[in-house]
Each structure stands twice: as structure tokens, then as C-alpha cells.
A protein has these predicted regions:
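Surface-exposed, low-hydrophobicity beta-strand/loop segments enriched in small/polar/acidic residues
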Residues: 1-168
């Protein structure tokens, strides 16, 4: 059984990026639920401040919401670099937050947040990093710049985020 991720599209701070691609799927097999998110950062931007949210404009810049009904109880996950980020910050982190109102250029720390993947340096092609924490049900996923000083629009950068859980 294949479905799309969450109850709708990502926030407009992601979906309105020129050239930005966001695709998702949720696969249920025998009580195991696999959620996959594919994002091309092209057209989104990073700011000059470490841990600011990646996106565009003033709209919410979340990738989507994790729910137990749709994505199950998450047990593990990973983030894989499919194309090295260029233009914007090449140190990209994944966070979860309880709020859906995080916007581009705002600090993720202004939300009730949890770091899921902290790159701690530039991503390289094929690099995979496991989740250091598990997103709770009803949290929203955000990408953040993991370094200061790179205020620019992305011209490249593709990631696959995979979450695995079970039916609650």
C-alpha cells in the first residue's frame, strides 16, 4: 500500500521555491511503515545564521508532519545526500518541531525543536547519517543551515530522508 506523506504538501516556504522538487511516499507492508521524502533544494535559500531554517519567503518552511496514523511510531531513520548542496550552506541539518509556523531565516531554536540529524560539516555524495533522535508524533520536519555565513540560493542539493516505524 503506497500513499503520499502526511496530510498535504510541505509548507509554502518549501513548495514555492523555483526549481524545488519535493516528493514523498508512505509504504505499509505487514505492519511496518516506511516513509520516504525526496527534496531538491534548488531554489531554496540558507541564511547567514547557524541553525536558521532553509526555505523561501514568509510561508511556513516545514517538509511535512509526522503522525502516528499516517507514518506509524517511528523507530529509526536516515538522511542521505544524493547531490552535494551548492550555492547555500553545504552543512544541512534535519530537525523536528511541534510548531508548523517555522519560516525561512528564522532560528529553529525559536520553536520547541529536536535535532534529528546534525551533519557537523559539508555533505558529500552518498553520505548517509542516521537519526540521533526520533521525531515524536505530530511534529513537523525542517531543514536548517548547520553553519553560519552562507546566505545564498541553492543551485543544487538533493537529499533522501527515510523514516521507518510500525503501526501504532
Amino acid at each position: 500500500n503506497l500513499e503520499s506523506f502526511t496530510n498535504g504538501a510541505p509548507g509554502t516556504g518549501i513548495s514555492s521555491g523555483t526549481g524545488t522538487v519535493f516528493k514523498s511516499s508512505v509504504q505499509r507492508v505487514g505492519g511496518i511503515i516506511k516513509t520516504s521524502l525526496l527534496i531538491d533544494l534548488t531554489g531554496l535559500a540558507s541564511s547567514t545564521t547557524d541553525l536558521d531554517i532553509i526555505g523561501v519567503g514568509a510561508g511556513a518552511a516545514y517538509l511535512g508532519q509526522i503522525t502516528a496514523a499516517k507514518n506509524g511510531t517511528i523507530l529509526t531513520g536516515r538522511m542521505t545526500c544524493l547531490e552535494v548542496p551548492a550555492g547555500g550552506a553545504d552543512d544541512v541539518d534535519l530537525y523536528a518541531a511541534t510548531e508548523a509556523n517555522g519560516v525561512f531565516d528564522a532560528g529553529i531554536g525559536t520553536l520547541a525543536e529536536t535535532a534529528l540529524v546534525t551533519a557537523a560539516g559539508a555533505w558529500t555524495l552518498g553520505l548517509t547519517k542516521g537519526l540521533s533522535a526520533i521525531p515524536a508524533a505530530n511534529q513537523y520536519l525542517y531543514l536548517c543551515g548547520g553553519e553560519a555565513g552562507t546566505a545564498a540560493t541553492y543551485t543544487a542539493g538533493k537529499f533522501l530522508i527515510q523514516l521507518e516505524g510500525y503501526e501504532a
